[in-house]
């Protein structure tokens, strides 16, 4: 599958999961398709999904991230040993871990296409991230206290881990 076919497969699969949306027309324009895909990923509840979807999603997201350009921490200059300050697209940072400004449920922002760090990280990591967060929270049995964090694999992000830090919402 080429990138366009992968994107269409992902969109159709996510639409098929939502009975009220399965007849949603898919835009012909690739940029509008990307917006629709991101929105569908943003509203998807944590749940298992088939292996074929994950394989296509992983290839697609990794390709999209590579096209944005990956920033490797080894090319940055630390301000102190082991401490780096960097500004840019956090979903392109290749390092040990990035920090997600999360809500107390840790499963992400469910507002479609909302431009927040939580949505960006959950979108480019893939649907596995939300499920991993849900599993951690179910095991814990209560919302994450403000100022506390949980760590998950980064899935399709170039970093190794995501630290989900529960913050106060003002």
Predicted segments — roles?
Residues 135-165:
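Active-site alpha/beta core segments
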Residues 45-71, 105-125, 153-156:
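Short, charge-rich amphipathic segments
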Residues 68-69, 85, 128-129, 148-152:
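Short, charged low-complexity intrinsically disordered segments located at boundaries
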């Amino acid at each position: 599958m080429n990138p366009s076919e992968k994107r269409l497969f992902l969109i159709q699969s996510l639409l098929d999961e939502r009975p009220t949306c399965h007849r949603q027309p898919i835009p012909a324009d690739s940029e509008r398709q990307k917006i629709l895909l991101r929105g569908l990923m943003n509203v998807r509840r944590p749940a298992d999904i088939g292996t074929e979807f994950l394989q296509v999603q992983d290839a697609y997201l990794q390709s999209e991230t590579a096209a944005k350009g990956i920033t490797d921490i080894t090319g940055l200059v630390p301000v102190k040993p082991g401490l780096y300050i960097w500004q840019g697209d956090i979903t392109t940072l290749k390092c040990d871990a990035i920090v997600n400004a999360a809500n107390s449920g840790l499963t992400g922002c469910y507002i479609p296409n909302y431009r927040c760090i939580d949505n960006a990280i959950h979108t480019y990591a893939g649907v596995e991230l939300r499920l991993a967060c849900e599993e951690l929270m179910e095991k814990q049995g209560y919302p994450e206290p403000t100022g506390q964090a949980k760590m998950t694999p980064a899935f399709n992000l170039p970093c190794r881990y995501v630290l989900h830090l529960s913050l106060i919402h003002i």
